[in-house]
């Protein structure tokens, strides 16, 4: 087997010419093994077929993760574990956002399924507004409107869509989650849809301004998922619950039928 060149030989020679440096290091070497004297044992036979595959962004010191780069790890069993990461300084197109919403089943590593106590420590950073003054219609073609009994929403069939609530959808990003977290804000207000417990009505929570960072107020965040022509809004704070409608009931949080969790986003 060919001998691997000593990449640190020149560096050692350079340091050895500096007597002050050498003397300063000598006393440390009594208690600490020298970095340059480190030896490496050959791989055991049972380790020969275990490896980790990394893309170029992981092997270069100066590279930065772009939006679509992945870190790919191959487990001993041959199972591919893949996690997409987002770069905060990378411009993200509408096509990229749609791809995330459409691709929710891609990940095998799913930090978004972590317990809420862990999720509450995650920071979500403002990215940009991705929909302005859009209307949400459920699978029965009912539109979301304000309920006059309080800070609630309800769904009803409208002949004039101008009466429907208009929402701004704001995208956020974090290092831990691969899905797309969004907030739903009533247009031209600071009223945000806030998730509650199962079967409880969602609330309209007034904020002083659009949050630049969300850490504790995760009730305001929903993972936007898209399957075919339908859109779903899964609570970040309650990952098993979705924004839902039901006949003669306020807009609420539900895990599925008999409540309706399917929506369509209608642009103005």
UniProtKB/Swiss-Prot annotation:
Entry-listed glycosylation sites: 102, 141
Keyword Secreted recorded: yes
Propeptide segment residues: 1-112
Phosphoserine sites (modified residues): 87
Modification(s) after translation: Acetylated within its nuclear localization sequence, which impacts subcellular localization. Proteolytic processed by CAPN1 in a calcium-dependent manner. Cleavage from 31 kDa precursor to 18 kDa biologically active molecules.
Location of the protein in the cell: Nucleus; Cytoplasm; Secreted
GO biological process: cellular response to heat; cellular response to lipopolysaccharide; cytokine-mediated signaling pathway; fever generation; immune response; inflammatory response; positive regulation of canonical NF-kappaB signal transduction; positive regulation of cell division
Keyword vocabulary terms for this entry: Acetylation, Cytokine, Cytoplasm, Glycoprotein, Inflammatory response, Mitogen, Nucleus, Phosphoprotein, Pyrogen, Secreted
GO MF term list: copper ion binding; cytokine activity; interleukin-1 receptor binding
Gene Ontology CC entries for this record: cytosol; extracellular space; nucleus
InterPro entries recorded: IL-1_alpha, IL-1_CS, IL-1_fam, IL-1_propep, IL1/FGF
Region (Nuclear localization signal (NLS)): 82-86
Free-text comment about domains: The similarity among the IL-1 precursors suggests that the amino ends of these proteins serve some as yet undefined function.
Function of the molecule: Cytokine constitutively present intracellularly in nearly all resting non-hematopoietic cells that plays an important role in inflammation and bridges the innate and adaptive immune systems. After binding to its receptor IL1R1 together with its accessory protein IL1RAP, forms the high affinity interleukin-1 receptor complex. Signaling involves the recruitment of adapter molecules such as MYD88, IRAK1 or IRAK4. In turn, mediates the activation of NF-kappa-B and the three MAPK pathways p38, p42/p44 and JNK pathways.
Designated name of the protein: Interleukin-1 alpha
Gene expressing this chain: IL1A
């Amino acid at each position: 087997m060919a001998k691997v060149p000593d990449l640190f030989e020149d560096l050692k020679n350079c340091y050895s010419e500096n007597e002050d440096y050498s003397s300063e290091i000598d006393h440390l070497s009594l208690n600490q093994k020298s970095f340059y004297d480190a030896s490496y044992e050959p791989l055991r036979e049972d380790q020969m077929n275990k490896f980790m595959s990394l893309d170029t962004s992981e092997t270069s010191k100066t590279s930065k993760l772009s939006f679509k780069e992945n870190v790919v790890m191959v487990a001993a069993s041959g199972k591919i574990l893949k996690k997409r990461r987002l770069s905060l300084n990378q411009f993200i197109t509408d096509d990229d956002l749609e791809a995330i919403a459409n691709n929710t089943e891609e990940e095998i590593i799913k930090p978004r399924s972590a317990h809420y106590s862990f999720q509450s420590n995650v920071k979500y950073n403002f990215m940009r507004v991705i929909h302005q003054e859009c209307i949400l219609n459920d699978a029965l073609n009912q539109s979301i409107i304000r309920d006059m009994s309080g800070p609630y929403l309800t769904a009803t069939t409208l002949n004039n869509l101008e009466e429907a609530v208009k929402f701004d959808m704001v995208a956020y990003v974090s290092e831990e989650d691969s899905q797309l977290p969004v907030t739903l804000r009533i247009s031209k207000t600071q009223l945000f849809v806030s998730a509650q417990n199962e079967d409880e009505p969602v609330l309209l929570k007034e904020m002083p301004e659009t949050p630049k960072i969300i850490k504790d107020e995760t009730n305001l965040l929903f993972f936007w998922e898209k399957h075919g022509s339908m859109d779903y809004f899964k609570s970040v704070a309650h990952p098993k619950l979705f924004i839902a409608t039901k006949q003669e009931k306020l807009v609420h949080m539900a895990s599925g039928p008999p409540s309706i969790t399917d929506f369509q986003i209608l642009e103005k």
